[in-house]
Amino acid sequence: MIAELADVREDVPHADVAVVGAGFAGIDLAVQLGRRGLRVLLIEAGRDSFDPAAQDLARFSNVGKPLREPDPEGPHNPYLDRAFRGETRIRQFGGTSTIWTGKWRLLNPLTFQQREWVPGSGWPITREELLPFHAEVARDHGIGDVDALPDGGRHHPLAQECTAAGIDSSLLHWQASPLRMAERYRDELRAMPNVQVLLGATATELVLDDAHRRVRTVVVRSLGGHRAELSADQVVLATGGLEPARLLLASDRQLPEGIGNAHGLVGRYFQDHPKTKRAVLRPSPALRRMADWLATDPLPRDQLLFGLSLEEQRRHRLLDHAVSVRPVFDYELDYPAADVVAVREALRNRSLRGLTRATLARAAAPRTLRQYVGQRVHRRRRGRVAHYATAIYLEQAPNPESRLRLGARRDALGMRELEIDWQLSPLDHESFGRLQGLLTDAFARAGLGELDFGPDELTLADAGDANHHIGATRMAARPEEGVVDRDCRVFGTDNLYIATASVFPTGECATPTFTIAALARRLSAHLLALRDDERAPALRAPGDQ
């Protein structure tokens, strides 16, 4: 059943599991649990189609390094409905899967390990524990053989040269038609008698029992003034990387510091992936012949990514990173490419620091602008490769001073809006500074070509973000170190869980969706085990007896 809160005239029945948020993780949880017979209540703030008033409830303020505003005319936006362009999180049935670009990538093994040079690193679960759930998700969504993904990047023509130079080549699978969770599962959810989907219902407060151990009710409100108190044995927050912390902090009537915040960690350790497109790769003859390996169209395809090997990262005490490269053909670009890219990224990130007057003058020349417009119009033609445009994605080190907190401004439902204080640490800056020279040398040794970071000093002040919101309710072995335990259960509670990238202790530089999906499947298995055995036996991986 799918209904709007405003249309519900009777009390909503008690559920086995209430899932707040109907995006990638929330819908997957509801489907998996519903198929096994659990009574599931799926609660979504948005409606079945895009509603600007509901979207406005997701507003936040930047008080630290600003999160960038996406380019509405960027290369991944034209296929989207115009209402979505420039949005990074969608309040609608289907969540942000509605605008997702379809990129799947595994986290590397080093991410899960405690690295002595990265304070706060290490996961309380292993990569091996999560891989069976990755495989299950990959099977269901046509991603291919998960076991082959780690080695798949080692079969290109320059693979041996890259390995010898200390460069790892990895794969990012890019779907031709990105998975839209609402489109795929709407009919199945509507037909399940044991699943109720409630739209237009924003969770504004979690009410605990007298012992402050269990969530007794989830208070939801609609923009039309309707209010309901919903109950379930187990409650899961699947509301993206920002909203779980907001709801925990806002639920402060019984616990002044908010739920799960006994150690003041809710909202702290917020991370994103700093990203820059300033570097240009002038390809070697061998790399020119690999243009079809590296082009980003047609889709689907497994896109190659380059980066220093895990051994080199450990040796040089670096944070993780990945370099994607795209062939730019000579008809596209015969003007000062690095200058135009530098100015474009600076404007997008609202910072002109690091740009010289000469760079600005070259980029603003009339001939340069005419040629830039021309290459945008004719971007899909083929010809001789002039160079490779790059995007460098960087891991952010865990940093307790990088945080989310409640601001003074309130939304239309009376909830305090988030303030995002995104802060990069000295380790982030030092790692990126060393990385540029090491990458340049390694690319040359591998025969890939000359990596040019431009004439101006490139720092993280010039970098934007990747819209990957990570870490604000981090997973840990102890409540003194995080907000949720290894089963994604909020410390200090018995029945409250979080299933978003906000539980990642670290997120390397990979797109987070694949890992979010795997964690949601793992949580499904845990909740099913709770139903089958009140003593909560050890978590079973798919296929285990």
Describe the role of every protein-language-model region.
Residues 61-150, 397-400, 407:
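Redox-cofactor-proximal catalytic regions of oxidoreductases
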Residues 1-17, 35-36, 529-544:
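Extreme N-terminal leader/targeting segments of oxidoreductases
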Residues 198-211, 374-403, 413-507, 513:
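A glycine-rich dinucleotide-binding beta-alpha-beta segment and adjacent secondary-structure elements
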Residues 76, 80, 103, 116-210, ...:
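Conserved redox-cofactor binding core of oxidoreductases
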Residues 81-87, 263-266, 273-416, 466-469, ...:
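FAD cofactor-binding and catalytic pocket of flavoenzymes
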Residues 35, 46-56, 206, 219-294, ...:
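Glycine-rich loop(s) and the adjacent beta-strand/alpha-helix scaffold that form part
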